[in-house]
Amino acid sequence: MTLSDLRDYFKSDFPWKESISVGKIDKNKERAVCFYHSKVSRPKINTIGGKGNRSYTVLPISILLRFGKNYEAAAEKAEEIYNFFDEKTFDLNNERVFVISPYNAPIDLGTDDQGVFENSLEFDLYITKKGD
């Protein structure tokens, strides 16, 4: 599974009509969401017998949300996206995905230089092949 696959899943199942990207957010837009590989360190998964015996992989992701200059609206939208993903299970590209956040809520990042509120949403995607 790639971040583009996840972006496309979000685009098809969540009511979001604003800017959406992978790897680089459009800072010219007041409303935008971007999917990144997480920079938060996670422990390595070791499997007895090697990677071929592993039944799942973990993909840590970060979602950056820019959502206008109203704090309440930005916090509400961040919570909506958080609730859309947290503790969710879905199938994508012949893989089963289990989503867990290491945090209890979105992370409020404050505003950028233009006064646009930003939130970070952190998730770990546990991915198994369907049938495993």
Show the residue positions of the predicted features:
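Acidic-leaning, charged glycine-interspersed low-complexity segments
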Residues: 85-130
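Mid-chain, well-packed structural core segment of small domains
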Residues: 67-90
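Short N-terminal helix-initiation segments at or just after the protein's N-terminus
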Residues: 1-11, 61-72
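Oligomerization/assembly interface segments of phage tail-like spikes and tubes
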Residues: 55-69, 117-128
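Short, solvent-exposed beta-strand/turn "edge" segments of beta-rich domains on protein surfaces
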Residues: 49-55, 112-116
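Short hydrophobic/aromatic patches at helix-to-coil boundaries
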Residues: 3, 7, 127-132
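Small/polar-rich, solvent-exposed N-terminal microdomains that initiate assembly or binding
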Residues: 1-51, 88
